[in-house]
Amino acid sequence: MKDLNLYLIRHGQTEWNIKDQMQGSQNSPLTQDGILGAKVTGQHLKNVPFMQAYSSPQQRAMETRDYIIHENDNVIPTFELADLREMDFGTWEGQHVPMLKKEVPEFNTYLTDPANFDASVNQGENYLEVLSRMKNALTTIVQNAPEQNGNILVVSHGTVLRLLLCVLNGGDWRLHRDEDYFPRMLNTSVSVVNYQQSDDQTEGQFSVKFFNNVDHLNQK
């Protein structure tokens, strides 16, 4: 019986987060609040015996992961997984969100109507492509777990985690951008997904235990 808990964390706040710029495959540095949030998250999770720690290969995610595990007493192997990267926003990357909302009609489709979003407009990814690779990422992680039971840290990004967690929680991916339907992921929020696979199963089951928890940040 395989029984794994995946701790899914959004990276810490970055400079482009506070400037309301699209990041995607590009990167901007963690702010001081972002670094503090990662450290506080690490303190919150310091007694969790993580077997492994994954992140996307993007700097903001790797740094957040490293700040978190630095607070842990255990020696934790780290890995980068490309499928955990943020959604590729193509030509929108680096652009200010208010400008895109005002001047680019398809951007508002991206925000409010995922099923009809045409990614050819910005030469980036669409939501189903993102969902497919995020599912692949989780499959890779659970298949490569060094033990049958335990905890694994996974640091990724807001857009992709929101989509993934909505679907794993039984939600409709077409509605996941609706704040009343499923919330956006906050910086250094903690979500836990359990994976169970019995010995006679070829494929296990993911279930969301909780998502987007930031209670630990309110105590910093």
Model-assigned labels for residue ranges:
Residues N108-E129:
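Short glycine/proline- and acidic residue-enriched helix-loop micro-motifs
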Residues G12, G158, V214:
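Active-site metal-binding loops of divalent metal-dependent hydrolases
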Residues Y7, Q13-I68, N122-K135:
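Loop-to-helix element that buttresses phosphate recognition and phosphoryl-transfer chemistry
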Residues K2-D3, M87-M99, Q143, E147-G150, ...:
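Acidic, low-complexity terminal tails and accessory targeting/binding regions
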Residues N136, A145-P146, I152-T159:
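His/acidic metal-ligating clusters that form di-metal
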Residues N5-I9, Y54, G150-S156:
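Beta-strand elements within well-structured catalytic alpha/beta cores of enzymes
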Residues G158-R162, S189:
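GST superfamily/GST-like fold recognition
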Residues V40-N108:
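Phosphate-coordination/substrate-recognition cap region in phosphate-metabolizing enzymes
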